[in-house]
Regions:
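Active-site-adjacent structural elements that line small-molecule/cofactor binding pockets in enzymes
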Residues: 1-309
């Protein structure tokens, strides 16, 4: 099973990009197969992925994930194809609807009809990355390419993933994208909700079996109580977001921190294998720094070993 890690540089880093490249080198040395970068309001995720992919050719790189509100698919396609060319075909484009509270406050746009926007965005971005052109006029998006939008060297076609966990988003994703990037979705939720819904939609659309790139907090540690307390603080914000509250509840849990995989090597390895049995095609660890640098290195070593499992 492919294992990867979401990378974030510490706030005290004098140069964010340099710090991420160094982390990526350490992750590759530990045997991890991929590095992923969220899209916040500071750095640019595809740009960071392009740099890391060039500097650390052992790793596949991905964006996890870019909110589609406030962005046009033509510009996202240009970024994704440039990164795909820069990394010689080792980039995964992850898209997301984003949380309404963040999208409305940040971009000043109403968070309305998100599923309709997702369908239109995926239709356009797929056309652009596959053919280099688009002529689409929908309710939310419109574009006509007056010249080629294809980036030479952006081969193979950029895989498009969506951070979809709700049934409507999963159906659209299965129909139009290459897979999903669920976060804080436990094995039961994968097995009973996410995997069946997206797989059925892909089959009906005549598409290949979708990837299920599962993101989850992982820390290998001997101090479980301390790391669990840190996880409670770090993940508390997700308890206030309806989409995450729902998916945590589907697992029979009350708080996001209960989904964090924390323990010794045997405990963590067993948990990750349960995710694989539930339908995860790839595991990407997040919040691996909750126990400090030594625990993070220990976590990455185990994940590197599991990549050969």
């Amino acid at each position: 099973m492919s294992t990867g890690v979401v990378l974030f540089a510490p706030p005290e880093a004098p140069n964010y990009v340099d710090a991420i490249v160094e982390q990526a080198r350490e992750a590759a040395a530990a045997g991890l197969r991929s590095a992923w970068f969220g899209q916040r309001f500071d750095y640019d995720s595809p740009g960071l992925a392009a740099i890391v992919g060039r500097e650390v050719p052992q790793l596949r790189v991905g964006s996890s994930a870019i909110p589609i509100f406030g962005r046009h698919p033509l510009l996202v396609s240009s970024q994704a194809q440039t990164t795909q060319a820069a990394t010689h075909g080792r980039y995964d484009l992850g898209l997301a609807l984003g949380a309404p509270a963040f999208m409305e406050a940040t971009f000043g746009l109403p968070y309305d009809r998100p599923i309709g926007l997702l369908r239109e965005f995926l239709t356009v971005v797929r056309s652009l990355v596959e053919t280099g052109s688009a002529d689409f006029h929908g309710e939310r998006l419109s574009t006509t390419t007056l010249m080629s939008a294809k980036v030479p060297g952006a081969e193979p076609t950029v895989p498009v993933l969506v951070a979809a966990m709700g049934p409507q988003a999963l159906r659209v994703t299965g129909e139009l994208a290459d897979g999903t990037i669920p976060y804080l979705a436990g094995p039961k939720t994968l097995d009973e909700h996410i995997v069946p819904t997206i797989t059925s939609a892909a089959q009906k659309a005549g598409r290949p079996a979708p990837r299920v790139v599962t993101l989850l907090p992982v820390v290998v540690t001997s101090d479980v109580d301390r790391v669990r307390e840190n996880a409670e603080r770090q993940l508390a914000m997700y308890d206030q977001l309806p989409s995450y509250h729902r998916v945590v509840g589907l697992e029979g849990k009350d708080r996001a921190a209960e989904l964090a995989v924390i323990g010794d090597e045997e405990t963590v390895a067993a948990a990750i294998r349960r995710y694989r049995a539930a339908g995860a095609t790839e595991i990407v660890a997040t919040e691996t720094d909750l126990g400090g640098p030594a625990d993070q290195r220990r976590t990455w070593r185990l994940l590197g070993e599991l990549a050969n499992d």
